[in-house]
């Protein structure tokens, strides 16, 4: 039985993860964590998940929660995730991180900390999205430089980072397949007389509004034809189920930094 703790247990995503753990054979909720001063600290974690009481109290004691689990699932912010990763490292516990918005420097720090424990760091835990990553690489290699690439993503109005971590990863996957440096070819803004589109650029466009869970479309646009590869998330349950799958997988791995491509055996 894999003992899984959840960081951000009182949030929307945290509740869905707790529900997913309860539905997963071979896994159990061992701890629930929230920030200091959160009004749900001290309450049973099952209520936010729609399960009723499950006998696990939401705590603000990070070290105690980590020490009581095999693996921590974290959907917070890069700053909080790195702190949680450090504490997991000190206690030799695995961690699954689904937070987005990491800078290159923060990702490098995560990789350094992952030398001591197995870590899954993925911008999107969905099986479908990770299949898309593989498909995008294959399509980009086949089409080469003859097709322009544009990426459009849409999320709910509460999302804090832009573009989404998934959209960035899609851009990175395509750029790598085409032998380009994503950081040099990504174009996030077009306005006014900005000149013709360059051959190598990858356009990144963002939509924010309402309660959109998540939509991503990658356009491969040629002369007289185009290919669109789209993934639409209808609920957050796919992310929560994916994170639990990653948690069960990572506890048996060697120290290192992994992503969902590793979890799903897509490499």
From Swiss-Prot:
Residues at which NAD(+) binds: 8-13, 34, 98-100, 122-125
Pathway: Amino-acid biosynthesis; L-lysine biosynthesis via DAP pathway; (S)-tetrahydrodipicolinate from L-aspartate: step 4/4
Keyword presence, Cytoplasm: yes
Enzyme class per UniProt: oxidoreductase
Main localization, broad class: cytoplasm
InterPro entries: DapB_C, DapB_N, DapB_N_CS, DHDPR_bac, NAD(P)-bd_dom_sf
Any one Gene Ontology BP term: lysine biosynthetic process via diaminopimelate
Residues annotated as the enzyme's active site: 155, 159
Localisation per UniProt entry: Cytoplasm
Positions contributing to (S)-2,3,4,5-tetrahydrodipicolinate binding: 156, 165-166
CDD domains: DHDPR_N
Gene Ontology terms: cellular component: cytosol
Keywords linked to the UniProt accession: Amino-acid biosynthesis, Cytoplasm, Diaminopimelate biosynthesis, Lysine biosynthesis, NAD, NADP, Oxidoreductase
NCBIfam families per the UniProt record, alphabetical: dapB
Family, as annotated: Belongs to the DapB family.
Physiological role: Catalyzes the conversion of 4-hydroxy-tetrahydrodipicolinate (HTPA) to tetrahydrodipicolinate.
Protein name as it appears in the record: 4-hydroxy-tetrahydrodipicolinate reductase
Species the sequence originates in: Geotalea uraniireducens (strain Rf4)
């Amino acid at each position: 039985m894999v003992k899984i703790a959840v960081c951000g247990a009182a949030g929307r995503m945290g509740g869905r993860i707790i529900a997913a753990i309860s539905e997963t054979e071979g896994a159990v909720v061992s701890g629930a964590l929230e920030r200091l001063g959160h009004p749900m600290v001290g309450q049973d974690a099952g209520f936010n998940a729609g399960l009723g009481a499950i006998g696990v109290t939401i705590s603000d004691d990070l070290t105690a929660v980590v020490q009581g689990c095999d693996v921590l699932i974290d959907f917070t912010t890069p700053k909080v995730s790195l702190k949680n990763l450090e504490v997991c490292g000190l206690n030799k516990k695995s961690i699954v991180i689904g937070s987005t918005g990491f800078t290159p420097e923060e990702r490098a720090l995560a990789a350094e900390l992952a030398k001591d424990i197995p870590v899954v760091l993925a911008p999107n835990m969905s099986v479908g999205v990770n299949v898309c990553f593989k498909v995008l690489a294959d399509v980009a290699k086949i089409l080469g430089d003859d097709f322009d690439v544009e990426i459009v993503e849409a999320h709910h109005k509460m999302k804090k980072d832009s573009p989404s971590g998934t959209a960035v990863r899609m851009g990175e996957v395509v750029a790598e397949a085409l032998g380009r440096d994503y950081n040099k070819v990504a174009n996030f803004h077009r306005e006014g007389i900005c000149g013709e589109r360059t051959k190598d650029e990858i356009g990144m466009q963002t939509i924010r509004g309402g309660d959109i869970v998540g939509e991503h479309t990658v356009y491969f646009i040629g002369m007289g034809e185009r290919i669109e590869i789209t993934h639409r998330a209808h609920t957050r349950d796919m992310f929560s189920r994916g994170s639990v799958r990653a948690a069960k997988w990572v506890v048996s791995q060697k120290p290192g930094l992994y992503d969902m491509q590793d979890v799903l055996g897509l490499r």
